Amino acid sequence: MRDRKWSRRDVLKASAVSATGLLFAEPLRAAAPPPTAVTPDLIEAARKEGKVSFYSALELNTAERLARTFEAKYPGISVRVERSGAERIFQRIAQEQGSGINAVDVANSTDPSHYLEWKKSDWLQPYVPEEVAKYFPADQVDPDGTHATSCAWMEVIGYNTDLVKREDAPKSYADLLDARWQGKIVKAHPGYSGAILTATFVLARDLGWPYLEKLAQQKVMQVQSAADPPKKILLGERAIMADGNDYNLVLLKDQGKPVEVVYPAEGAPLIIVPSGIFRGAPNPNAARLFQSFFFSAETQQMLVDVFAHRSFHAQVREKGEHIPLANLKMLKADPAAVQAQSEEIKARYTKIFGV
């Protein structure tokens, strides 16, 4: 059981034995609960539980910073971080829930379609932090209150400025097909990374699978996480990255490293990262407190300033080095379509790239 990999089809089967106990039952939907403020009673109840488990697809240093900051703000409550790629987190939660194991309190994923699955399976507990209700746009909050967008970023092209002159650097996805870049490109994998799964869906939709077939002929170095391509071009193992997180490059540039961000002419995939509480959370009050902390202006500003993420919180200032989202051409995914096509995308990508 432990070694089994769960697909979205398995999740739907597992939902049949969820808390409802009704085969193929569709959970009843209700309006989102009223916004909840952080009160002394909530803090005290969370302290009595003493811990919270946070499953996260954010980079480990980001997830750990969130955990340690929360622990400093609320002494007596420890945070256990379980960090992995979004698709691995999805499989783990499916396995746990399908086995009747309630281990996760709060989960965030770089694949928004996961929340559609979890919501349909009735695994998410509606909870709306006060600041989400006040300061987040409606399109970044689930109407039923089961999740909201905790942060965002863009998947971009990038290059090592010691290896590629600015005037020669690719400006578009089409430019990556130039013969000069053969054997010089690195790319992340949609079978591991939820962000890259979303980006692959967008590129297949807008540029077509023939584009990806041509890109595969460029002798691309294949890595797992969307955070890996920036590391490879920094080390000079490859000159160009075909995808990867813009925030990694922004942070490296802040350190004076020889990398540059390219927002492709065709547009860059927007990656949103929802967060939600699980209905069977073993530490429900600590989960609520952590979720409210996650969406607070203070925490959101930290994610922007320290980790170069994007925030939809109305009171949070954009990082100075960032091109404002309003000035960028964004390629937005449809989570429901990603959900429906996920397994096909992974299989087709693996066949095309041979990995």
Regions found by a protein language model. Give the residues of each.
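A bilobed periplasmic-binding-protein/Venus flytrap-type ligand-binding module shared by bacterial periplasmic
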Residues: G158-L163, F201, I271-N283, F294, ...
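Periplasmic-binding protein-like
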Residues: A152-W153, R180-G191, L212-A216, Q222-V223, Q255-A281, F293-E318, ...
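A ligand-binding cleft/hinge motif common to bilobed small-molecule-binding domains
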Residues: S113-E117, A239-P258
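Extracellular/periplasmic bilobal clamshell ligand-binding domains
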Residues: K319-V355
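Extracytoplasmic ligand-binding site segments that recognize negatively charged/polar headgroups
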Residues: S53-A67, V79-Q97, N102-P230, L234-E237
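N-terminal secretory signal peptides
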Residues: M1-D10, A14-G21, A25
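Short beta-strand->loop
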Residues: L124-A133, G145-A148, A174, L251-P269, ...
